[in-house]
């Protein structure tokens, strides 16, 4: 499917509400087993208002068609308030917008989809990210900001093509951006009981498994 501007507008307005409901101001801890040395490590991913525009592949423009920079918060609020006009945006000229729009709805279920994470291998000319997470049909590119990662690009692509060392995700937990401890378990690898695995002390200090119940295979 090739998106028209009307299609794009409809999709980004709809997905903005889903983003607000499912991901906005949430923080995820991705606990994984490093493929190269078998060590258990983690990354944290946070979702802000300002990250949403990057995921759409759209650019805000002025009345003369000039791209407006540093308007990501404005873009998101226009989407939430259904105030994004067709003349207010354009598709990026590098051709990535169609790919991003196709992947955007899938992103909202990122915690259900993610089975693998790894360092990005720079195989795509227009994808500038540090890490990737996802599965066989979807990949979320992550950019590092200080000690956490933020979402910057989503693609309908097998993650194993985008990382040279795909590492198994053991668990994903979620918390509010201002909450101290991760206590909501969103995903656990099939057959894994988190109560029976020895996690590094650093990770143990960040999570609370009091409400976790092993569901079996």
Each predicted region: which residue ranges?
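Compact beta-sheet-dominated globular domain cores
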Residues: 135-190
């Amino acid at each position: 499917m090739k998106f028209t501007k009307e299609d794009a507008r409809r999709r980004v307005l709809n997905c903005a509400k889903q983003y607000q409901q499912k991901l906005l101001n949430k923080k995820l801890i991705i606990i994984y087993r490093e493929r190269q040395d078998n060590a258990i490590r983690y990354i944290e991913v946070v979702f802000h208002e300002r990250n949403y525009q990057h995921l759409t592949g759209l650019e805000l423009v002025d009345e003369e068609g000039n791209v407006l920079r540093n308007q990501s918060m404005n873009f998101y609020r226009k989407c939430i308030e259904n105030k994004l006009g067709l003349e207010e945006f354009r598709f990026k000229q590098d051709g990535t917008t169609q790919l991003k729009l196709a992947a955007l709805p899938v992103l909202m279920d990122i915690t259900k989809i993610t089975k693998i994470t790894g360092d990005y291998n720079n195989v795509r000319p227009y994808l500038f990210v540090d890490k990737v997470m996802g599965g066989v049909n979807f990949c979320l590119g992550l950019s590092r900001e200080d000690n956490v990662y933020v979402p910057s690009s989503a693609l309908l692509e097998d993650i194993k093509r985008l990382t040279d060392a795909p590492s198994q995700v053991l668990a994903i937990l979620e918390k509010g951006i201002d909450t101290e401890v991760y206590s909501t378990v969103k995903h656990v690898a099939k057959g894994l009981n988190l109560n029976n695995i020895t996690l590094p002390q650093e990770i143990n200090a960040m999570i609370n498994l009091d409400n976790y119940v092993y569901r079996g295979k």
